[in-house]
A protein has these predicted regions:
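Active-site-proximal, substrate-binding regions of enzyme catalytic domains
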Residues: 45-73, 85
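Active-site neighborhoods of divalent-metal-dependent phosphate/nucleic-acid chemistry enzymes
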Residues: 71-119
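Hydrophobic packing residues within well-ordered alpha-helices of enzyme cores
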Residues: 24-25, 44, 86, 124
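Alpha-helix capping/helix-boundary segments
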Residues: 10-11, 40, 102, 119-120
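Acidic, PIN/NYN-like endoribonuclease modules and their adjacent C-terminal/linker elements
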Residues: 1-3, 103-134
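Alpha-helix N-cap/helix-start and coil->helix boundary motif
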Residues: 41-45, 83, 120-121
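Aromatic- and histidine-enriched alpha-helix N-cap/loop-to-helix transition segments
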Residues: 39-42, 98
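Short, well-structured N-terminal submotif of metal-dependent ribonuclease cores
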Residues: 1-39, 51-64, 127
Length: 134
């Protein structure tokens, strides 16, 4: 397996035009494959809904962002990791279950993790994962 595990913070920054690094990370992932846990789709939909509700995006911009997200060459890991693994990672590295899912996928696939979440990046480094862009 090649590519990168991308969390919602990177995809959201790319879709909302908030960070130039996000575009680079998305491009890197598109070359080798973007891997995400199933919850990524829920988180990203929520980001777009909140941005629309807070008027950071117009309805047309939100539809465009949704189409861009849907067009990403994303490989979704359909089976969530066992609860015990998420719980153990969350406890050991002080993560939410959501962030633990990204870390677990990066560790299991032995792929770098792309994130703008400082706490998740710190935890991933402690767990032995590589951070994309480091």
């Amino acid at each position: 397996v090649s590519g990168v595990v991308i969390d919602c913070s990177v995809a959201a920054a790319w879709l909302l035009g908030e960070d130039d690094a996000a575009e680079s990370l998305i491009a890197v992932g598109a070359e080798g494959g973007i891997h995400v846990p199933a919850l990524w789709h829920l988180e990203l939909a929520n980001v777009l809904l909140v941005a629309l509700k807070r008027k950071r995006l117009t309805a047309a911009e939100a539809r465009t962002a949704e189409r861009l997200a849907a067009a990403l060459p994303v490989a979704t890991d359909s089976a969530p990791p066992p609860l015990g693994i998420l719980f153990a990672l969350g406890r050991e590295y002080d993560l939410t279950a959501y962030d633990a899912a990204y870390l677990e996928l990066a560790l299991r696939l032995d792929l770098p993790l792309a994130t703008f979440d400082a706490a998740l990046a710190r935890a991933a480094r402690k767990a032995g994962a590589t951070i994309a862009g480091d």
